Each structure stands twice: as structure tokens, then as C-alpha cells.
């Protein structure tokens, strides 16, 4: 048995395919009758199912060379053009399919076989060129020839290029449309052409075996053989196999998937070492699997580790030549099988190989079902965005069928000389040569950069080496990080040199600046100005006063003051007294303020007379800093520093942030984190001449960064009451009048300002929300613009990036002292390009959540890679990835990724595309509704000076740029988006578009217009359905690719237009198709 497995494993892919097909045929109940010849007068010749699939794809995207295939024959002797031409004519006489074209009538194609055909032959003499130039010229000419499209209706579907390389050396390069030629045909072509060429040169008989049938006989037989009973059996199996499969596989693309898929592609080649190839073949033999099964499993494991997908469909071609009558017949017989792979938690590579082996055996036994029938029966959403059922393919070729064109240049050099197309997002093509596996990744260049695919080749070799050595590897643990990636992660997370400046407390920063710049203005508020000496002394007096009131270490003290110098004095006084700062925003609802005070345990509150009434019902002692008695007591108090020893682990402040349950949770931040904050502030390079606006709400931790970056530089902090800090013209006027040079704003707030109107604003720091390309383009001209990222749990900022006008602002790299980790759901590092959840580590982490140990344990985890005892990681809930340049890119929130109708959707991607609309300043997308009624809803704010966009206009804008499943059904155009007191978007306050009516929400009237009525009648006749409504989708009411061509033919005839088949995929609803008709008719009017 072991010897048999070894012999099977040693078969070439072509031998193996033939063996498996014959084995399956031998297992059938009895011998099938031979395929009969078709009577000459039996009416129109039908297309085979495979031909019809490619004919339809050509109708969908006419004029594309993506389904051009080629073969070549090296002629190592002098040869005459006449002999080549005679051999080609004899070849087409032997194989009718090479004389076939596909005219159509009423959207129904048929085969038309010409009586005779001598293929077009172009001859080019390259003999005068040097060797290297000759090879390059030959490759270029062949590549250009392969990219020329064919006309399927008129043909011919074969053309030839004769390249004379030397007097005794020539290359015959043939390009076919795939409808008449497949990979299996390459060997037959070489055999037949070699014999026919020799016969033409010598005047002898070629000695080729007679063909019992022609391709048209096969096509007719296939249509008859696959009767309803057999089709039902096959469909039953395949429907069950793909039931519930995700419609797309989400790979780590470098660019968003375009609304209409392109076919521009490229190839990146690789070769597995001989010893690894041998080990993989041995693994196949030990596992009772073929090399094809083994390498398909390796590919599936690679896709899982690279993308995180657990349920995927991988397409693979099969020769589909089980009948002996087809052995010598050139033509397109190949079918495509959809191999579904499902990965369970804890599964090993060996487990997956056993699953794949079973899947392949079952699929080969049922390979007769035409792929297009499966697509139609699956009722998958038909779109021009991606291939149905699968977008990733795997091919394993026999090395003996490799193109003789490959001998002209070294393997690596071929990629640069062979511009190509890509049928799918990604295809792995392996060639099984005697000593090694070589191959290439064919990829869509609209989605991937070459460097990403090169890294993928490295990952393949890493993973293959691991499983060849031990198939017991858990899939989730398989190594796929390249050496460069590992080196980068070590560099960005490397420990930093110790610096005493980074051990200071926040009030220590103030004290240092008071020594260096005692008479420089520290605070400029509407009520008064304070120098650094005055601010330090005022904070000292208040700190002594607090100590006299009995304030203890780590006792929370509330501070609720609005835009006055006292607000800054109180902040530093609480810290100098060794207490815990509890900043409160007076604009918060009374219920929220009461909850924070009660939950924090604060018994002392520093506020002002105008705000005292807001806290009257709370059980706290109130100190009114603007009260005359308080002022007098403070004036008589000591101005020296209390000088209390404060350990780094003592709490500095507690800030309450929104909780997922709606109840705020208190984040406890120790003084240790201020050192990390100092490192952050240093990157903004402020000077004593800088004037920093205090914009953030005091209950938002960015307000502390505003203080630190100002006072560490000896600069001036500009204060205004919160009521005047209104984004828009009021804020712009304030920045001009107060000569503000530096701001820290949320992108929402920054988007309300115009860069050209604020020339004095020299430093802009964006934080708190995802920054946009539009903001970078507007503000990066001549300014220092930064994107800062960091949750409250990591002391304000953990990463910083300097922005550039030509890219979406990234999160950048970690601030010194922090570590960043992009992990999967098993808490393992993910490869570059793949999205994962961001975890933060380092000295800047908060202690946890106040009185919530369970929540703390859930969000703060032990750091398995930490070098210090007790090292922890904070789970941010943010979805990021490492970009190709080694910077972190923000993708969204884990709770902002949704799944609708099987599609995983990142709402932020839709928002970004909406904001690209010239009439939209900012946008938000949510999911509204419940259960099966869940729908995407888009909200847009009109851009200043632009016409108010309509729901229909926004919908069409997105349709032109995004897949259909990412286009919201509902739209609301608003004057402004609701925000919370800290300037962030308040999603909960957005209105429900389901309650709106008219064009704003995108609702359509139910009545049909005359064009819709006429199209409705055509749908009823062709599909045999009840009258459809204007919003009905063609593919959801029973339409498929077969009926789509007939529908479009009928519509074009009825309205005198020339719509392409693709229009039904762009606008699959009845009303959408009617709009396309009306637009086409309008264009044709004089």
C-alpha cells in the first residue's frame, strides 16, 4: 500500500489528473457509450458549457485579453515560412475547433465552423540583434501579441508569430482564445505541430492518429448527457458544499477593491528549494495524499495565516477529459471546481490536509457540473466588483508543459518582460518539475503591490518548511512573519535609554519651567494672565490649602472650572498636594456628573460660583475659588512648594470615559505615565514663543497634553470659556484674535476650519478620531501637522505620525517607552498588511478601571513578550495593520466592522469614499434595522459653498467607487453631525433615516414609469415570473448569466439602444436598468 501511495505521489499533475479521471470512470456502474458524431444537418451547434461561460464573460467585459492563452514551439533547425504556414493549415483542418467562431442571435450564441482556415501568421526576423537584446525583443513581441483581444463573433480565434532567432533557430508563438484551447491542449499542439511541420517539409504523411470526434460533437453530447436528472444530482452535492460560504475572501489588499474589477495583472516568481520539494512530496506520500492535495492545503493554510479567513473557497481547474475520445482533441474542456476549506480553532495542518483530501476526492467525482451552472444556482450576488464564488485560485502544472518561451530568459527576468492580466485577485500557479516546485503568484495590480506578493512568496516557503517537518503544527501558530518584519517589530519596540526628564510628574514639569522662565507668560485667560512664577506659586498656595482641608494621598479631588486661570491653578494644586485629579466638564448632564462624583468617591470639589448650583445635590465639600473668602485665605497662605514625595506608581488622575454599557468608567492613570506623555510632547517641538490653545474638554485626556506640551516648552496656554470654543467661524476668529500658533483638535473640529485663513497656525495635532486624506492635503502645506493616537488607558498618546499631503495620515510608530502589537484573535502577531487588533504596552499604561476589576482584567492582559515582571498589554479595540513602510494604519473599530448578507464591511471605508464627494464635508455610515431588515445608512454634511447633495447623487457616487454591497440604501443629508462635549462624533444621537421620507432618505415611489413598465414585461416573458417592482433585483427574482444576455438583447431591440451586458450588473434593479436605458437614449439624441 505504501509503495502504491509513493507511486501515486510521484505522478506529474497531468498524469495524476488522467489517473483520477480514469479511476472515477472505472468506478462507474457500467461503460458509457461512445460520444457519437453529430449529424451534419442537426441545426445550430451549441456551445459547450465551458465555452458558454467564457463567451458570457466576453460579453460582460468585451475586448479584454484576460482569457487569451498561448503556446510555443521551438524549432531548432532552418525552416521555411511556407512549411510553417502549411503545417498551421493542416492543424486547423485536423481540429475543427480552431476554425470556430461564436456569432449570436437574440443573445443566444452558437458555434460556426468555417470550412477552412489558415491562421494569421506574422514573421519577424531578430537574427541581427545581439543575444540579450534578441531574447528581450522576442519576449516583448510575444507579450504584446498575447495582449491583443479577439472578436469571438468573427474570429479567427488563433494567430501565430514566427520569430527567427538564428539561421537554425526559430520560435513559433501561438495565441488562442481560451474558448478553443486549454492547458491540456499544449502538449497535443506540440505533438501535432511537430509532426505536421515535418510532413510539410518532407512531403510525407504526419502519421497522427485519426480523431474519432470533433469538439462540436463533444459540445452537443455534453448538453444531451447532462439531463435534468444528472444535473439535479450534481447540483444537490455542490449546493450543499457551498451553502453559507462567504461570497468574498477578504485578503490584505494594498488598495481598496474598485467598484468595477480590473484584469490588469502581473506575476512574481519563486522556486522552492529541492530539499523542501522532496520533503513536501514525502509528506504527501506519508499522508496518503497527492502533491496537488498537499500543496492546495499549504496554500489554504497560507491564506488563513495571511488574511485570518477561516472559511474560504479556492477555485481550481480540472482537465475534465475522462473520456478516451478526448485524449487527442484540442479544445476547451477544462472545468473549474470550487474547493471549500473550513478551518476550526485548534486545527492542525494534518487535520486540514485530511479535510482537503476528502474534499478533492468528492469534487473530482462530481466535476461534470459546469461551473457557471453552480454560480447561477448559488444565487450569489452578481457584481462587477469580484468573481462569483471565489476570487483566489490554485493551479498545479506539469513541468513538461512549460512554455518554450521560458527558455529565452532567466526565470526572474521573465516577470519584467511579460505584461499580463489576472483572472482573479490572486492565483498560485505551481509547476511540478523533476527536482523542485517552481511557480508564480498571478495577482491583480489594482489590489496588490509587488512587494506584498514577494513577501507572500517568503511566507509560503516559511510555512511549507514548517509543515513538511511537522504536520502537527497548529494552523494558528504557523510562522509567516518574514525576517524583515520580525526585525522591524524588534526595532520599534526596543527599550529606550533612560532619561531623568522622563521621570518627572506633571507639576514637576511646571516647576522646571518656572525656574527656567519665571517671568514668561504661562497662562493667558480672559480674567487674568499668569507668569510661570505666578502660576507655580498660586498652585502651591492652593495645594497647602487642600492639605489643610485634610486631603490625603490618592484622594480624588474634583475640578470643575470653565475657561479661567483658576482651572490651571487647581489642576496643578491637586497634583502638588499628592491627591488624584478628577477633571469634570461643567457642560456634562447633571446625572453624569453626579455619577462620576459618586463612583470616584470624591468628597471635595474645586469650582466657581457660577457653577456651584450644578453640584448642589451632591455629597461633596465645595471650594469656590472665585469666592472672596477663599481668595483671601489663599493670599495669606505659603507660596513654597509642598515638596511631597510622590512615587511613580501613585495615581495622578482619573478620567471617566464612555462605557459600552452606557455607564462611564473611570480610568486610573499613575504619575509614571506622565513620563511617556513628556516624550510625546517633545515631538511637537514647541518653543517659548508658541501659543497653545486650550480647546479640549477638561474631562478629555488630551487637555493634559495641551498643558504639558505648553509648560514643558515654556510657552503660553491660551484659555477661553467653553461656550466660545465652537468649531467653525467662531473658533477660526478666536485663533486669529488670540494669535494661536498650536492646536490639538479632533479631525471633526479641524474640518470646520480653512487652512488658508489661518496663516499664524503653525502646528496642528489631530487626535481623538480617524484623520482623513482631505485634512492632510489641506493643512500640510508649510505647517507641522501630526496625527496622534492613544486611548486614555495609555496616557493620551502612544503613537505619533508626521502627516504628508499625499497619503491618509497613519498612526505612525510608537512613542519611546511604548510597545505596539498587532495581534489576531489568538493573540499572535499578524503579518504586515493583515488587519488585527492593536495592543499597547509600556510604562504609559493606566492602572486599570476604578472599582471594576473584571473589566480591568478583560482589557489589561499579561504581556507574554514583556521583559519586566508584571508587564501588561492594553486591548484597544482598534483595528489596524502594519503598512508596507512600517507605519501603523488605522482601519476602524472592532465594533465598527459589520457583516451584511455574508459580506464583511468596514464602515470607515464607505465613510472615506463619501467624504471624497465634492459636496460632502464629513460623513458617517451606520447599520440600521434588525434581523433581515438590517441596512446601511449614510449621513453626510454638506461642504461649505457646495450644492446640497441628493441621496440619489450620493448613491451613484458610491456605486462608481465601491462594490454594490457597500452602498447604503438610506441617506440623510444633515447640516451638522452631533458631537459630544469633547468634540467627538456622537453616533447615538444621529437621527433614524427609516423615519424619514422623500429623496433625503432615498425612498422611491412604488409606481413604475413607462420605461420600467416595458422592461418589466420583458423580465416576465424571459424569466417567467410575476410582475416585478421597480426595486426588484434581476438576480434575486430568478435571473442568471444565461438569461442576462437574452434580457439585454430584448431591451436593446425594444428601445433601439446598445446597452452592454455589464449594464445589468451595474444596475441590477428594474429601475436601475430603466435609468440606463433612458441615459443611453438621451446620449443618442442630436
Swiss-Prot record:
Cofactor(s) listed: pantetheine 4'-phosphate
UniProt keyword annotation of Phosphoprotein present: yes
Domain notes: Modular protein that contains a condensation domain, an adenylation domain which activates the alanine residue into an aminoacyl-AMP ester and a peptidyl carrier protein domain which bears a phosphopantetheinyl arm to attach the activated amino acid.
Metabolic or biological pathway, per its Swiss-Prot or TrEMBL entry: Secondary metabolite biosynthesis; bialaphos biosynthesis
Region of interest (Condensation), residue spans: 45-484
Record-level Gene Ontology MF annotations: ligase activity; phosphopantetheine binding
Region (Disordered): 22-43, 983-1007
Matching SUPFAM superfamilies: Acetyl-CoA synthetase-like, ACP-like, CoA-dependent acyltransferases
One cellular-component annotation, GO: cytosol
The organism of origin for this protein: Streptomyces viridochromogenes (strain DSM 40736 / JCM 4977 / BCRC 1201 / Tue 494)
Positions bearing O-(pantetheine 4'-phosphoryl)serine: 1041
Similarity field: Belongs to the NRP synthetase family.
Keyword Ligase: yes
Reaction catalysis annotation: holo-[peptidyl-carrier protein] + L-alanine + ATP = L-alanyl-[peptidyl-carrier protein] + AMP + diphosphate
NCBIfam families: AA-adenyl-dom
Residues covered by region (Adenylation): 510-901
Gene3D superfamilies reported for this sequence: 3.30.300.30, 3.40.50.980, ACP-like, Chloramphenicol acetyltransferase-like domain, Luciferase, Domain 3, Nonribosomal peptide synthetase, condensation domain
Protein name per Swiss-Prot or TrEMBL: Phosphinothricin tripeptide synthetase PhsC
GO-annotated biological processes: amino acid activation for nonribosomal peptide biosynthetic process; antibiotic biosynthetic process; lipid biosynthetic process; secondary metabolite biosynthetic process
Reported consequences of knocking out the gene: Mutant cannot produce PTT. PhsC cannot take on the function of PhsB and vice versa.
Keywords recorded for this protein, A-Z: Antibiotic biosynthesis, Ligase, Phosphopantetheine, Phosphoprotein
Occurrences of domain Carrier (ranges): 1006-1081
InterPro entries linked to this entry: AA_adenyl_dom, ACP-like_sf, AMP-bd_C, AMP-bd_C_sf, AMP-binding_CS, AMP-dep_synth/lig_dom, CAT-like_dom_sf, Condensatn
Cross-referenced CDD domains: A_NRPS_CmdD_like, LCL_NRPS-like
Function: Involved in the biosynthesis of phosphinothricin tripeptide (PTT), also known as bialaphos (BA), a natural-product antibiotic and potent herbicide. Adenylates L-alanine and loads it onto a peptidyl carrier domain via a thioester linkage to the phosphopanthetheine moiety. Shows weaker activity with aminobutyric acid and L-serine.
EC number: 6.2.1.67
Amino acid at each position: 500500500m505504501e509503495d502504491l501511495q509513493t507511486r501515486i505521489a510521484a505522478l506529474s499533475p497531468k498524469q495524476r489528473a488522467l489517473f483520477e479521471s480514469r479511476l472515477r470512470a472505472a468506478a462507474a456502474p457500467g461503460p458509457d457509450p461512445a460520444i457519437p458524431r453529430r449529424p451534419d444537418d442537426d441545426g445550430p451547434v451549441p456551445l459547450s458549457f465551458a465555452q458558454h461561460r467564457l463567451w458570457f464573460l466576453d460579453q460582460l467585459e468585451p475586448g479584454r485579453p484576460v482569457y487569451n492563452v498561448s503556446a510555443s514551439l521551438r524549432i531548432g533547425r532552418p525552416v521555411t515560412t511556407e512549411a510553417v504556414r502549411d503545417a498551421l493549415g493542416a492543424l486547423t483542418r485536423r481540429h475543427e475547433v480552431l476554425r470556430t467562431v461564436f456569432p449570436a442571435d437574440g443573445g443566444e450564441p452558437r458555434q460556426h465552423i468555417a470550412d477552412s482556415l489558415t491562421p494569421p501568421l506574422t514573421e519577424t526576423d531578430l537574427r541581427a540583434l545581439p543575444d540579450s537584446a534578441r531574447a528581450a525583443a522576442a519576449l516583448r513581441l510575444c507579450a504584446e501579441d498575447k495582449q491583443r483581444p479577439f472578436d469571438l463573433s468573427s474570429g479567427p480565434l488563433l494567430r501565430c508569430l514566427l520569430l527567427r532567432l538564428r539561421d537554425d533557430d526559430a520560435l513559433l508563438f501561438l495565441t488562442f482564445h481560451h474558448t478553443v484551447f486549454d492547458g491540456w491542449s499544449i502538449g497535443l499542439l506540440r505533438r501535432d505541430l511537430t509532426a505536421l511541420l515535418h510532413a510539410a517539409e518532407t512531403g510525407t504523411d504526419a502519421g497522427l492518429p485519426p480523431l474519432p470526434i470533433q469538439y462540436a460533437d463533444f459540445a452537443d453530447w455534453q448538453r444531451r448527457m447532462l439531463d435534468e436528472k444528472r444535473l439535479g444530482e450534481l447540483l444537490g452535492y455542490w449546493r450543499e458544499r457551498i451553502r453559507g460560504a462567504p461570497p468574498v475572501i477578504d485578503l490584505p489588499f494594498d488598495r481598496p477593491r474598485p467598484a468595477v474589477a480590473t484584469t490588469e495583472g502581473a506575476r512574481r516568481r519563486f522556486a522552492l528549494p529541492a530539499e523542501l520539494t522532496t520533503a513536501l512530496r514525502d509528506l504527501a506520500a506519508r499522508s496518503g495524499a497527492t502533491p496537488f492535495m498537499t500543496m492546495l492545503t499549504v496554500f489554504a493554510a497560507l491564506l488563513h495565516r495571511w488574511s485570518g479567513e477561516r472559511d474560504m473557497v479556492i477555485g481550481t481547474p480540472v482537465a475534465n477529459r475522462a473520456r478516451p475520445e478526448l485524449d487527442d482533441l484540442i479544445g476547451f474542456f477544462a472545468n473549474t471546481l470550487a474547493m471549500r476549506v473550513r478551518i476550526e480553532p485548534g486545527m492542525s495542518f494534518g487535520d486540514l490536509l485530511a479535510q482537503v483530501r476528502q474534499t478533492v476526492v468528492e469534487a473530482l467525482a462530481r466535476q461534470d457540473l459546469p461551473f457557471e451552472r453552480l454560480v447561477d444556482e448559488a444565487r450569489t450576488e452578481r457584481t462587477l466588483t469580484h468573481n462569483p464564488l471565489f476570487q483566489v485560485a490554485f493551479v498545479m502544472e506539469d513541468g513538461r508543459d512549460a512554455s518554450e518561451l521560458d527558455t529565452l530568459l532567466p526565470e526572474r527576468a521573465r516577470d519584467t518582460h511579460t505584461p499580463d492580466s489576472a483572472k482573479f485577485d490572486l492565483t498560485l500557479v505551481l509547476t511540478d518539475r523533476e527536482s523542485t516546485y517552481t511557480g508564480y503568484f498571478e495577482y491583480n495590480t489594482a489590489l496588490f503591490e509587488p512587494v506584498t506578493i514577494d513577501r507572500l512568496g517568503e511566507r509560503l516557503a516559511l510555512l511549507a518548511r514548517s509543515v513538511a517537518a511537522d504536520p502537527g503544527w497548529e494552523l494558528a501558530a504557523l510562522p509567516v512573519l518574514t525576517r524583515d518584519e520580525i526585525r522591524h517589530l524588534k526595532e520599534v519596540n526596543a527599550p529606550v535609554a533612560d532619561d531623568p526628564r522622563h521621570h518627572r510628574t506633571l507639576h514637576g514639569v511646571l516647576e522646571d519651567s518656572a525656574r527656567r522662565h519665571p517671568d514668561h507668560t504661562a497662562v493667558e485667560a480672559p480674567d487674568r494672565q499668569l507668569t510661570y512664577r505666578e502660576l507655580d506659586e498660586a498652585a502651591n498656595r492652593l495645594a497647602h490649602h487642600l492639605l489643610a482641608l485634610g486631603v490625603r494621598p490618592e484622594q480624588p479631588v474634583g475640578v470643575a472650572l470653565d475657561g479661567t486661570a483658576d482651572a490651571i491653578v487647581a489642576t496643578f494644586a491637586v497634583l502638588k498636594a499628592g491627591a488624584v485629579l478628577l477633571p469634570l466638564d461643567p457642560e456634562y448632564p447633571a446625572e453624569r456628573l453626579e455619577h462620576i462624583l459618586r463612583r470616584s468617591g470624591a468628597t471635595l470639589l474645586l469650582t466657581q460660583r457660577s457653577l456651584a448650583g450644578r453640584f448642589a445635590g451632591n455629597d461633596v465639600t465645595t471650594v469656590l475659588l472665585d469666592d472672596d473668602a477663599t481668595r483671601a485665605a489663599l493670599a495669606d497662605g505659603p507660596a513654597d512648594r509642598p515638596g511631597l514625595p510622590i512615587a511613580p506608581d501613585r495615581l495622578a488622575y482619573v478620567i471617566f470615559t464612555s462605557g459600552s454599557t452606557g455607564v462611564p468608567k473611570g480610568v486610573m492613570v499613575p504619575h509614571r505615565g506622565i513620563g511617556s506623555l513628556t516624550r510625546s510632547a517633545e515631538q511637537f517641538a514647541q518653543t517659548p514663543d508658541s501659543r497653545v490653545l486650550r480647546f479640549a474638554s477638561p474631562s478629555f485626556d488630551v487637555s493634559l497634553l495641551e498643558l504639558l506640551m505648553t509648560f514643558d516648552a515654556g510657552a503660553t496656554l491660551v484659555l477661553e470659556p467653553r461656550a466660545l470654543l465652537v468649531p467653525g467661524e467662531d473658533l477660526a476668529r478666536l485663533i486669529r484674535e488670540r494669535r494661536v500658533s498650536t492646536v490639538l483638535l479632533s479631525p471633526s473640529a479641524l474640518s470646520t476650519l480653512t487652512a488658508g485663513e489661518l496663516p499664524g497656525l503653525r502646528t496642528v495635532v489631530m487626535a481623538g478620531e480617524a484623520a482623513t486624506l482631505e485634512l492632510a492635503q489641506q493643512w500640510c502645506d508649510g505647517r507641522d501637522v501630526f496625527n496622534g493616537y492613544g486611548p486614555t488607558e495609555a496616557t493620551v498618546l502612544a503613537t505619533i505620525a508626521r502627516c504628508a499631503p499625499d497619503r491618509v495620515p497613519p498612526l505612525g510608530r510608537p512613542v519611546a517607552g511604548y510597545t505596539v502589537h498587532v495581534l489576531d484573535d489568538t493573540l499572535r502577531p499578524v503579518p504586515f498588511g493583515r488587519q488585527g487588533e492593536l495592543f499597547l504596552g509600556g510604562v504609559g499604561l493606566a492602572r486599570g478601571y476604578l472599582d471594576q476589576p473584571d473589566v480591568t482584567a478583560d482589557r489589561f492582559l499579561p504581556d507574554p513578550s514583556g521583559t519586566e515582571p508584571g508587564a501588561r498589554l492594553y486591548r484597544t479595540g482598534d483595528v489596524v495593520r502594519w503598512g508596507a513602510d512600517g507605519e501603523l494604519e488605522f482601519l476602524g473599530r472592532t465594533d465598527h466592522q459589520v457583516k451584511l448578507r455574508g459580506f464583511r464591511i468596514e464602515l470607515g471605508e464607505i465613510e472615506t469614499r463619501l467624504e471624497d464627494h465634492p459636496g460632502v464635508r464629513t460623513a458617517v455610515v451606520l447599520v440600521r434595522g434588525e434581523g433581515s431588515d438590517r441596512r446601511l445608512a449614510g449621513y453626510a454634511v454638506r461642504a461649505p459653498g457646495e450644492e446640497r447633495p441628493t441621496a440619489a447623487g450620493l448613491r451613484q457616487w458610491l456605486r462608481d467607487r465601491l462594490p454594490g454591497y457597500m452602498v447604503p440604501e438610506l441617506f440623510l443629508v444633515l447640516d451638522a453631525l452631533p458631537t459630544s462635549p469633547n468634540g467627538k462624533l456622537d453616533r447615538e444621537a444621529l437621527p433614524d433615516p427609516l423615519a424619514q421620507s422623500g429623496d433625503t432618505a432615498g425612498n422611491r415611489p412604488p409606481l413604475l414609469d413607462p420605461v420600467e413598465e416595458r422592461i418589466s414585461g420583458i423580465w416576465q416573458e424571459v424569466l417567467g415570473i410575476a410582475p416585478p417592482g421597480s426595486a426588484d433585483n434581476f438576480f434575486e427574482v430568478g435571473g442568471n448569466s444565461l438569461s442576462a444576455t437574452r434580457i439585454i438583447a430584448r431591451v436593446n431591440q425594444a428601445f433601439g439602444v446598445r446597452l452592454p451586458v455589464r449594464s445589468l450588473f451595474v444596475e441590477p434593479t428594474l429601475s436601475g436598468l430603466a435609468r440606463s436605458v433612458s441615459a443611453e437614449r438621451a446620449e443618442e439624441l442630436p
